[in-house]
Amino acid sequence: MISELNKKNKLNQNSNSLNVSYVRNINIIFGNYPYPDIIHNFILDIKNNLDIKMENYTNVKGNMTNWNYFLDKSKFINFITFLINKHQTTHFDIFGHFFEKKTIQNAWGNEIKKGDSLDYHKHPCLHGVLYLTKGCDLILPELNLKITPEPGDYYIFPSEILHGFDESKENFNRYSLIFNIVENNNAFEYSKKLRAVRSRSHT
């Protein structure tokens, strides 16, 4: 769920996106991935593939997989395909001809325990998060917004959006899958990788 930090401002919200004006007009795409069994499997993937070298090494002051763990996983590619099918009519600039125009640069999982935090930072590109569990809110201070995680909820953000959170006070772990989307400089290579993954999933 997405809500305001300061209730004095009014949100301009549509059924699956939200316009927020500050220095520039911001569009946040959101929805729910309604497959709890796949969400559960994503959690297991993260739990079983945490990279000890990444612990507290990045803006994530907690545990995470390596940056590219989910890139070639068929479950993740199916999720991206779901996003394309869901949003290409309303957000054609992003999802139209997606695999020809865009590349998923990184896709990783986070595990946030009590006392862990996320340093406030920005991504230089389009980026998204798929929440796999409930957990502490994601704070977007410049937009006066907070995002309360619910399993299956996803959000796609434009570049340069400051976000983070202070130490989690939850008594349970928070799991999420994060990905960066960049303009495609090598459509052929990514398409080749995608075909190879799909071919493996049918054998």
Labelled PLM ranges:
Residues 197-203:
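Short, cationic low-complexity segments
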Residues 20-23, 60, 129, 182, ...:
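Extended aliphatic helical segments
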Residues 15-22, 56, 104, 108, ...:
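Alpha-helical context
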Residues 96-168, 172-190, 194:
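Catalytic core of non-heme Fe(II) oxygenases with the double-stranded beta-helix
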Residues 1-100:
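Non-heme Fe(II)/2-oxoglutarate
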